């Protein structure tokens, strides 16, 4: 990916896009995840970032860049322990958001990502199924089962469009 991405209050992408992220937006994302187990606002913000990238940014684009965008946003959600590719019995869930205080009934989130280039769009359902199977396997692991109120999602990006499915 060309250029630098900085996710602290103000975001600069390719020196052209100037996205302001209000503290209240993070608060809304946090509430939605912690209290409802939903990721709609998180996905919406990530979608904005993807749409602001240039076509050149997508030349050698991969799944890890989608995950990185979500990871950088989630770093600001301070009530969660954020885990990326946490090894669990030789399996690696892409992102886990685990509530730091598990006595408050906050929801946890597990996300599995996949990426397709625009010309591979016809493989969307296949990738969604692959991601769903993976996340269902992860959900059966003891360390994952121990996370209370866990909501699981798959996100397949086709170039700059995100397709989200809830798995439980």
Model-derived regions: residue spans:
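Domain-level recognition of nuclease-like catalytic cores that cleave nucleotide substrates
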Residues: 128, 143-168
């Amino acid at each position: 990916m060309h250029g630098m991405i900085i996710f602290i209050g103000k975001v600069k992408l390719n020196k052209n896009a100037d996205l302001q992220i209000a503290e209240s937006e993070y608060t809304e994302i946090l509430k939605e995840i912690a209290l409802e187990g939903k990721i709609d606002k998180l996905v919406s913000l990530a979608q904005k970032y993807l749409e602001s990238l240039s076509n050149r940014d997508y030349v050698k684009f991969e799944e890890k860049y989608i995950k990185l965008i979500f990871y950088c946003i989630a770093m600001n959600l301070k009530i969660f322990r954020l885990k990326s590719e946490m090894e669990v019995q030789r399996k690696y869930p892409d992102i886990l958001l685990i509530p730091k205080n598990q006595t408050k009934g906050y929801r946890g989130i597990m996300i599995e990502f996949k990426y397709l280039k625009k010309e591979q769009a016809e493989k969307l359902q296949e990738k969604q199924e692959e991601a769903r199977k993976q996340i269902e396997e992860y959900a059966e692991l003891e360390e994952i089962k121990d996370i209370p109120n866990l909501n699981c999602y798959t996100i397949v990006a086709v170039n700059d469009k995100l397709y989200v499915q809830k798995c439980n």
